[in-house]
């Protein structure tokens, strides 16, 4: 006997096809209600209703109020997907005046031996830490004068995020080791990438940030 499958098939109508195609052309899996309004030409209420239908059909996952992610078709009928957590962190931080820091930056620079359980982000604006689909996003409030020692890093083949450079990562870790798994983990990371570290830059950063551990 044939059983009814309660999960909806991931079919695309003309409007949803327009949205999906446009976002893919932009290499943009994460999107907001504002994006939907601009792409689909819908009013606010209609855009929200449209996105709700996409979530119900398994085409989109809601990450938080107003923030969504397209589900890759290769996931089949899976309906839960977050995408790359570093890109989610970038969007949560507003896309500017931020950088992935501490333990997350150590992971980006291959200074850890195992994946980090939380994503650490330093941002100028105060942000509340949150959990999305089991991943912790922890925000550290920074000052504008301390927004230096930052570089771009490829999160995927299409999208970059801002990450503290290796020397700034070490200094941040010495200043706040609790966000890196402890001072021992910072020391291990420094040893693992010792050939890439600039002693002169470490001292310069330490002076600017008033971190006496390096001195």
Model regions and ranges:
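Positively charged, aromatic-accented nucleic-acid-binding surfaces
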Residues: 86-94, 101-106, 164, 180
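Hydrophobic alpha-helical interaction segments
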Residues: 2, 151-215
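Exposed, interaction-prone assembly regions rather than primary DNA-binding/catalytic cores
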Residues: 98-152
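Hydrophobic/aromatic-lined pockets within catalytic cores
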Residues: 41, 55, 110, 175-179
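A residue-level signal for conserved active-site and pocket-lining positions in enzyme catalytic cores
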Residues: 36, 105, 170
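Short beta-edge/loop segments at beta->alpha junctions of small alpha/beta modules
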Residues: 2-97, 132, 194-215
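Short amphipathic alpha-helical segments with coiled-coil-like heptad repeat character
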Residues: 44-46, 113-115, 178-182
């Amino acid at each position: 006997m044939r059983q009814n499958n309660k999960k909806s098939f991931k079919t695309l109508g003309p409007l949803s096809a327009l949205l999906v195609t446009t976002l893919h052309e932009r290499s943009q899996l994460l999107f907001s209600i504002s994006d939907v309004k601009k792409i689909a030409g819908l009013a606010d209420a209609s855009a929200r209703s449209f996105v709700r239908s996409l979530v119900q059909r398994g085409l989109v996952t809601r990450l938080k109020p107003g923030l969504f992610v397209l589900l890759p078709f290769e996931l089949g009928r899976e309906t839960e997907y977050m995408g790359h957590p570093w890109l989610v962190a970038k969007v949560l931080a507003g896309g500017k005046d931020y950088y992935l820091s501490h333990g997350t930056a150590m992971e980006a620079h291959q200074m850890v031996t195992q994946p980090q359980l939380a994503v650490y982000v330093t941002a100028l604006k105060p942000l509340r830490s949150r959990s999305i689909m089991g991943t912790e996003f922890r925000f550290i409030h920074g000052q504008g004068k301390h927004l230096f020692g930052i570089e771009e890093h490829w999160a995927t083949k299409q999208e970059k995020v801002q990450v503290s450079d290796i020397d700034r990562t070490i200094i941040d870790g010495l200043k706040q080791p609790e966000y890196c798994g402890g001072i021992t983990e910072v020391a291990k990371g420094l040893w693992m990438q010792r050939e890439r570290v600039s002693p002169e830059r470490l001292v310069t950063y330490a002076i600017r940030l008033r971190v006496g551990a390096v001195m």
